[in-house]
């Protein structure tokens, strides 16, 4: 039985199809959350990744983990309608096995450090009890009215440009 269903998740996260990557929340504590994503062949990334061997891109697995973390951060906030959880860092990401259509991706995230508006979380993603990915993500709580911070401009010397 789900603690949060898709409609409750949609009330918490701003993501929408095709980028809402959490279908249900199964467990939630103060510093830990478990969510699932049912991976289906109808998702747009499988058109090109890869046509003859559809595999969920690793970055989308990490995004699903980060969205699960975002539910934990935003769930108990009274003014969450005015907040966003921005992914600001990914560390120690490892992809162990491919995730394919028909899989149920289970994401478990735990807060390992929290300071003011920033939370660092460690997580694993599994399919049928087998670890398929792991990563640490850092999320920043921001007001929706704030413009997201831009990446610093990188200056490439003219002679190094391709």
Swiss-Prot record:
InterPro entries according to UniProt: FabA_FabZ (IPR013114), FabZ (IPR010084), HotDog_dom_sf (IPR029069)
Any one Gene Ontology cellular component term annotated for this protein: membrane
Coiled-coil portions: none
GO MF term set: (3R)-hydroxyacyl-[acyl-carrier-protein] dehydratase activity
EC number assigned by the record: 4.2.1.59
Keyword vocabulary terms for this entry: Cytoplasm, Lipid A biosynthesis, Lipid biosynthesis, Lipid metabolism, Lyase
Catalytic-site annotation from UniProt: 49
GO process annotations (BP): fatty acid biosynthetic process; lipid A biosynthetic process
Cellular localization per UniProt: Cytoplasm
Enzyme class: lyase
Reactions listed under catalytic activity: a (3R)-hydroxyacyl-[ACP] = a (2E)-enoyl-[ACP] + H2O
Function: Involved in unsaturated fatty acids biosynthesis. Catalyzes the dehydration of short chain beta-hydroxyacyl-ACPs and long chain saturated and unsaturated beta-hydroxyacyl-ACPs.
Family indicated by similarity: Belongs to the thioester dehydratase family. FabZ subfamily.
Name the record gives this protein: 3-hydroxyacyl-[acyl-carrier-protein] dehydratase FabZ
